[in-house]
UniProtKB/Swiss-Prot annotation:
Pfam families: ACAS_N, AMP-binding, AMP-binding_C. One of its GO terms (cellular component) is cytosol. This is Acetyl-coenzyme A synthetase. It is an enzyme of class 6 (ligase). CoA binds at residues 191-194, 311, 335, 523, 584. The gene is acsA. Mg(2+) binds at residues 537, 539, 542. It comes from the Bacteria. The modification N6-acetyllysine is found at residue 609. Its EC number is 6.2.1.1. Acetylated. Deacetylation by the SIR2-homolog deacetylase activates the enzyme. It comes from Shewanella loihica (strain ATCC BAA-1088 / PV-4).
């Protein structure tokens, strides 16, 4: 194996890990040669009401696309995360919660969490929520967010969690698509010392003329500050819970019954409702949580992701709780009020496993390692990274400053669509290279293909595809199976196209090189460029806009917008700021353009297609080798854009 920056598995980790290198190779081989037998065995890791006999029926043919796992079995996700732990672990901590203000602390045992979930499940039923209904959830990072998700799962309702940073328009589009009758929110969230007007955002979203489905809004009092109240529609969380019974028989769900919807940015504009089902998802989330993080009974596990993202679903709620872990939930941001907060929380709660994002690591790096002078960190055993590829220098900083060079780093690659981790080191099995996601998880068959779909062998670079299904895979785009086929299976026939490019080195390790489609990864969160462009063009002074990602020291990728103004509109710094605020209001703070360059014209082909590769290179300040511009209708546009670019390094 090439030794360039190779970090060997620590011997004490290898000796005690669930999986060592020899076992990984044996299990991986079995998982791809005999997936039926492999998953028949590992499907038993969760509790089934009616055991499955059929394991796998999947087709990646875009004309006959179907994905079914454990499909004649029945179960309930809430029972797997709660009830099955009660006999031995009712008094074990399920959730440790720390508020934005470190003085705010709460804990819930598995017994207490079970009671809360049963009560809220009954409360939902009292408001007419039935099996198969979509419930929209717009909550802060409080234990009640997990309660809501598990209560929905208990009664067979489908939760659709919307990230608390999204705008009213974004909420409205998700409510409309899911036809939600019930929305659950809080008066306000608290994050980084600021209050987030969650209820006000919901009110604005529901005032949208196309939102006609919502009958009830359940409001948790988080801050207690006064909020607008709609009589007959709005109900206080506390008043529902006062009268709700603590006993709730769980619905028996088919393995392929929907568990949740999570909307993700598409390159075509409208967000896609990614649908995950119950059986395969839970098997995969719990198995990857145990093996990728080498989770051991009694450990404290902290995933810093927001519940509004897939990482919060799979590795803050379902995976860890199915495994009976104690999870830490933090309401705020791990570098507030000072960058030392992350270390303080690790020490305060004796965290053993930390799962966070490169964007936070880079932000902490920028503050300097002396911020961690008072940090002990001796409880930490395993550290993970998620959301985007981590650059090697951030990896090394994380390893040295947070992990004290003792903790293996699992740099995990996966997507909303995959349900769980697909490519990652295993702590006791995989020597790591900073910046590489390394090897596939069990049952996952990655490949690289060229633009014609031909598989490329050996050390190479290409489009990353997956050749066969795995249990955690999404099943469809909600209400639009054709879009599911078109987005993921038509580009390269018979394969799942990830939308990412990757490089495979001579050791067979995978290095993710980033999106190859029109999606930007900002601080580990995906945004469709079409969404941002649509928001800009909706402004009265904008004639045309093109949006690309560019390298950003903190966020990984920043948003660079080229804007052509309407005739007669004057370019000004005031207008630039107005447009930034406009996008922020239309989509959310995450989508705010970092740089807006005025563009008299955009590079287009004669058929009118914008040539984004030129725009990406100019935004990245790579202006010496732009490639062939002969297909452009007006090549002179390029020179002007280079001349007026904003991201130049002097």
């Amino acid at each position: 194996m090439s030794t360039q920056s190779l970090y060997k598995v620590p011997s004490e980790i290898a000796a005690n890990a669930h999986i060592n290198d020899e076992k990984y190779k044996k299990m991986y081989q079995e998982s791809v040669v005999n997936p039926e037998g492999f998953w028949r065995e590992h499907g038993q890791r969760i509790d089934w009401m009616k055991p499955f006999t059929k394991v796998k029926k999947t087709s990646f043919d875009d004309h006959n696309l179907s994905i079914n796992w454990f499909y004649d079995g029945t179960l309930n996700a809430s029972v797997n995360c709660l009830d099955r732990h009660l006999a031995d672990n009712a008094d074990k901590l399920a959730i440790i919660w720390e508020g934005d203000d470190a003085a705010d602390q709460r804990t819930l045992t598995y017994g207490e969490l079970h009671t809360e979930v049963c009560k809220f499940a009954n409360a939902l039923r009292s408001q007419g929520v039935r099996r198969g209904d979509v419930v929209t959830v717009y909550m802060p990072m409080v234990p009640e967010a997990a309660v809501v998700m598990l209560a929905c799962a208990r009664i067979g309702a489908i939760h659709s969690v919307v990230f608390g940073g999204f705008s009213p328009d974004s909420i409205a589009s998700r409510v409309i698509d899911g036809k939600s009758k019930v929305v659950i929110t809080a008066d306000e969230g608290v994050r980084g010392g600021r209050t987030i007007p969650l209820k006000a955002n919901i009110d604005e979203a529901l005032s949208h003329p196309d939102v006609t489905c919502v009958e009830k809004v359940i409001v948790l009092e988080r801050t207690g500050n006064p909020v607008n109240w709609v009589e007959g529609r709005d109900i206080k969380w506390a008043s529902l819970m006062e009268t709700a019974s603590e006993h709730c028989v769980a619905e028996e769900m088919g393995a392929e019954d929907p568990l949740f919807l999570l909307y993700t940015s598409g390159s075509t504009g409208n967000p896609k409702g990614v649908l995950h089902t119950t059986g395969g998802y839970l098997v995969y989330a719990s198995m990857t949580h145990e093996y990728v993080f080498d989770y051991k009974e009694g450990e404290i596990y902290w995933c810093t992701a927001d519940v509004g993202w897939i990482t919060g679903h799979s590795y803050m709620v379902y995976g860890p709780l199915a495994n009976g872990a104690t999870i830490l939930i933090h309401e705020g941001i791990p570098n507030y009020p000072t960058p030392a907060r992350l270390g303080e929380m690790i020490d305060r709660h004796k965290v053993n496993i930390l799962y966070t994002a490169p964007t936070l690591i880079r932000a902490l790096m920028a503050e300097g390692k002396e911020q961690f002078d008072g940090f002990d960190g001796s409880s930490l055993r395993i550290m993970g990274s998620v959301g985007e590829p981590i650059n090697p220098e951030a990896w090394r900083w994380y390893h040295e400053v947070i992990g004290h060079e003792n903790c293996p780093i699992v740099d995990t690659w996966w997507q909303t669509e995959t349900g769980g981790i697909l490519i990652s080191p295993l702590p006791g099995a995989t020597d790591t290279k900073p910046g590489s996601a390394t090897r596939p998880f069990f049952g996952v068959q990655p490949a690289l293909v060229d633009n014609m779909g031909n598989i490329i062998d050996g050390a190479a670079e290409g489009n990353l595809v997956i050749l066969d299904s795995w249990p955690g895979q999404m099943r469809t785009v909600y209400g639009d199976h054709d879009r599911f086929a078109l987005t993921y299976f038509k580009t390269f026939r018979g394969m799942y196209f990830t939308g990412d490019g990757a490089r495979r080195d001579e050791d067979g390790y995978y290095w993710i090189t980033g999106r190859v489609d029109d999606v930007i990864n900002v601080s580990g969160h995906r945004l469709g460029t079409a969404e941002v462009e649509s928001a800009l063009v909706a402004h009265e002074h904008v004639a045309e806009a093109a949006v690309v990602g560019y390298p950003h020291d903190i966020k990984g990728q920043g948003i660079y917008a080229y804007v052509t103004l309407t005739k007669g509109t004057q370019e000004s710094e005031e207008l630039r700021q107005e447009l930034r605020q406009w996008v922020r209001k239309e989509i959310g703070a995450l989508a705010t353009p970092d740089l807006i360059q005025w563009a008299g014209g955009l590079p287009k082909t004669r058929s009118g297609k914008i040539m984004r590769r030129f725009l990406r290179k100019i935004a990245a300040n790579e202006v010496t080798n732009l490639g062939d511009a002969s297909t452009l209708a007006d090549p002179a546009v390029i020179d002007t854009l280079i001349e007026t670019r904003l991201n130049r390094s002097e």
